[in-house]
Amino acid sequence: MLPLTMTVLILLLLPTGQAAPKDGVTRPDSEVQHQLLPNPFQPGQEQLGLLQSYLKGLGRTEVQLEHLSREQVLLYLFALHDYDQSGQLDGLELLSMLTAALAPGAANSPTTNPVILIVDKVLETQDLNGDGLMTPAELINFPGVALRHVEPGEPLAPSPQEPQAVGRQSLLAKSPLRQETQEAPGPREEAKGQVEARRESLDPVQEPGGQAEADGDVPGPRGEAEGQAEAKGDAPGPRGEAGGQAEAEGDAPGPRGEAGGQAEAEGDAPGPRGEAGGQAEARENGEEAKELPGETLESKNTQNDFEVHIVQVENDEI
């Protein structure tokens, strides 16, 4: 009974022992796999030769691969493996390209494909926006290559935005529109100029002179009365006939002669109108002008005196 039990146990444990994993040289760890398969997108003559040999194996004889640069080779590979023509390579397209270039024999066993680690490494280092897709710019620009030749103590080159900003400020300073806005007076200066102009216009020395000039140019009630008197003297009427009779009679004394003499004497002698005219001339020459209400009262009094004198002359002629 015991040998039978031992035989059954041996038969049950034998397949399990043969199927258990074993250590061997045919199964390297992940670190060894990563070292054996470098990133072909990294700059270097060895990686470039690897990609060129892959393209030669494809039979692309229309392109001279020896004269292509690294950027041109990568763009050529990108165009070959962008199957959906989206302008981006996803993980499967990267896996297909790297498997065909690095390990063609591992394409039939995806579970043991060592290129998967390379795809993960490429997406980790070169996928800058982290969307899981590779653009041509991300494929060509390997991170850390541009700063490799720069020493730590060496200052970096200034950004191109700084000279543009300086040039823009100089153009703004030289622009005629900015100069006009700088030269144009502001609202405070205009208001200040208006206040000074009003002060000059309200100067008490200049205001009477301006009123005197206005009085001299604009005909007032005195000028209208004198014009009416001249018109009456020229037009034929009872006064004109009386004046003609007075001249015909000569120097004979009479009431009409006395009236004509008085009229001529009033023409020669200064009267109220002459005094008013002298006052107006004195105002125009620079004397101090009187206030406007007093001047209007004086003109009214002069007009009344002139009308009374005309009535007296008519009564004398009649």
From Swiss-Prot:
It is found in: Secreted. Induction: By p53/TP53. Keywords: Calcium, Cell adhesion, Cell cycle, Growth arrest, Metal-binding, Repeat, Secreted, Signal. InterPro entries: EF-hand-dom_pair (IPR011992), EF_Hand_1_Ca_BS (IPR018247), EF_hand_dom (IPR002048), ER-Golgi_Adhesion_Reg (IPR052110). Residues 235-272 have a biased composition (Low complexity). GO terms for biological process: cell adhesion; negative regulation of cell population proliferation; regulation of cell cycle. Residues 1-19 form the signal peptide. PROSITE patterns: EF_HAND_1, EF_HAND_2. The keyword Protein transport does not apply. Residues 219-286 are annotated as: 4 X 17 AA approximate tandem repeats of P-G-P-R-G-E-A-G-G-Q-A-E-A-[KR]-G-D-A. Residues 186-202, 223-233, 281-293 have a biased composition (Basic and acidic residues). GO terms for cellular component: extracellular region. Residues 69-104, 114-149 form the EF-hand domain. Ca(2+) 1 binds at residues 82, 84, 86, 88, 93. Residues 177-318 are annotated as: Disordered. Ca(2+) 2 binds at residues 127, 129, 131, 138. It comes from the Eukaryota. Sequence repeats lie at residues 219-235, 236-252, 253-269, 270-286. GO terms for molecular function: calcium ion binding. Probably digested extracellularly by an unknown serine protease generating extremely hydrophobic bioactive peptides. Mediates cell-cell adhesion in a calcium-dependent manner. Able to inhibit growth in several cell lines. Both EF-hands are required for function. PANTHER family: CELL GROWTH REGULATOR WITH EF HAND DOMAIN PROTEIN 1 (PTHR23104:SF15), MULTIPLE COAGULATION FACTOR DEFICIENCY PROTEIN 2 NEURAL STEM CELL DERIVED NEURONAL SURVIVAL PROTEIN (PTHR23104). This is Cell growth regulator with EF hand domain protein 1. It comes from Homo sapiens (Human).
